[in-house]
Amino acid sequence: MSEKTTPSINELLDREAIRNLIISFNALGDRGRVAEMIQVFAPDATLKAVGQTAVGRADIATLLQANPLLPDHQVTRHHIGTQTVEISGDEAVARSYFSVLTNIGLDHHGVYIDHFRRQPGGAWLIVEREVRLDWQAANSVYAPLPVHDRARPQVSAGFPKMPNA
């Protein structure tokens, strides 16, 4: 939150709009509705996931459709947990922990690191998303996915990030 002790109504509305984008992405993905999923991204957005990078909605759709699909009769449900949203003017950054449940139970979990920009009409869209996978079950229904190496600290702006970040 900003230095203010009480957020404004507009800031609260912005936070809720951003959270709704994150949740919508997962709900649509669980139903396989890729054409609608990509609408949460700005036209020139970047998605970094499963060791690949896609730029623009068309490439993002291709990446999402190319991911290992669940076998027939499998169920997948993405759940958002702890979440932070920091807003600065017309830009925002969110970190959202996620867990994915399938027919085996907990299948994998990680964090979304999202950058948002308010569009000219006032709507928020994702301009960059990094999907960082922290763990995947040995019996996952998905093909093996690249898991983030939490043992190596990441360096950003000259300061090492905490290994557990």
Locations of regions flagged by a protein language model:
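Acidic/histidine-enriched, glycine/proline-rich intrinsically disordered or flexible terminal extensions
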Residues: 137-165
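Short beta-strand edge/turn micro-motifs at domain boundaries
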Residues: 93, 111-145
